[in-house]
Amino acid sequence: MKILVVGANGQLGARCCALLVEAGHDVRGSVREPARGEALRALGVETVLADLTDTSSIRAAASGAEVAILSANPVVPRAGDRPALVEEGLSRAPAVLAAEGVGRIVLPSVPVTDVDEAVPFVRARRRLEDALAELRAETVCVRFPPFMDVHLALAGSSIPLRGAQNATVDRPSPFLRSFRKSTGTLVEDRGLILVPGRRSHRNAFITVDDAARAVVEAATRDDVGGLPHATLEVAGPQPLSWDEVAATYGRVLGRRVRVLATPAVVYAVAQKVLRPFAEVPSNTMALNRYGASSETAWRNVGGGLLDPASMTTVEEFLQEKVRLPD
C-alpha cells in the first residue's frame, strides 16, 4: 500500500514511517528541508519536499498515495514559523488529498474539553475534524491522551527523552528551549514535578510508540469501526493521577517526588496578556490551559486498535528509560 505521512520528521510521524516500512508498505514522507529526511531515507522512506503553506507541494506529495496520515502540526514551532499559516495550510490539506485520489485520511487528534474554543491549536483541530467528515474519502480521527514521551518531560524530567529520536521536546523552539533550560531536570535534581491543573486529574497516558502503532492500524486495517468517518479515542493502559505519576517517579528514582500544581486560570491570564505581542508564548500558555482543564480517565484501552496487553504503562516506560544513558 502506498502511504503518505505528512510531517514525517516529527516524533509521531517518524515512528509511523518506521512501523509502516517494517510492515512492508511503500512509504512516502513529507519534509520541509532535505536534511530533515536523511534518517527517513535510511529506513527506506521516499522523502518529498512539501510545505503545508504551499498547496501545490501537498498536491504533488499526494500523487499516487492510497492513504495519508496528517501528523504535522504547529504545536512546537521552530524559529520563524507562523503557526496560524501552518493551520491554514492544514485546513486545506484534506480536500487536496482527497482530490488527488487518497482513499483514507488519518488524523491524530486530541481530547474534547470545555476550553477547546479558547485554545488556537485545539480549535483548529476541531475544524479539521469537521472538514474530514465532509469528504468522500474514508477518514479516521484518532484522539489520544497525553503522550508520556512529551508530557512527562514537560513536567520537569529528562528521563523520557533518553534514547528518543525526533523528540518533540527537543525541537529548536526558542521559547521551549528557554523553559526547558530552567525546568528540564527538576524531577531528578529536586524531586519536584510540574503539573498543569489539579494534581488529582487522571489521564490514561500513552507512549508515542503505542500511539504510532494505533495510527498505523487506523491507516491500514479494513475493519476500523465507524467508517467511512470514524472518531476513535485510544486510551493508554491505565489512568493515573498526577500524584500517582509522582509516586511512580519516586519508585523509579528511589526518592520522594512532590507535585507543584498550577491552576488553569493562571495559564488563561498569561495567554491573554501575551496574545497582543507574543503569539508563540501565548499559544503555549493556551495549551497549558488546555492540559490543566482536561482529564482523560478513559477505560477503552487501545481503542479497538491495539491489544491492551501489548501497551506500555508509565512505570514500564520510566523503568526502561532510566536504564538508558543520559
Where are these regions (language model features)?
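Oxidoreductase cofactor-interface core, primarily capturing Rossmann-like NAD(P)-dependent enzymes
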Residues: 2-11, 15-26, 55, 76, ...
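SDR active-site strand-loop-helix element
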Residues: 6, 30, 71, 105-110, ...
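NAD(P)H-binding glycine-rich loop region in Rossmannoid oxidoreductase-like domains
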Residues: 29-100, 114
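Short, hinge-like loop/turn segments at secondary-structure boundaries
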Residues: 45-48, 65-66, 123-125, 157-161, ...
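General small-molecule cofactor/ligand-binding pocket signal
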Residues: 48, 142, 258-262
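Short, amphipathic alpha-helical "lid/cap" segments that border enzyme active or binding sites
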Residues: 55, 59, 90-94, 208-216, ...
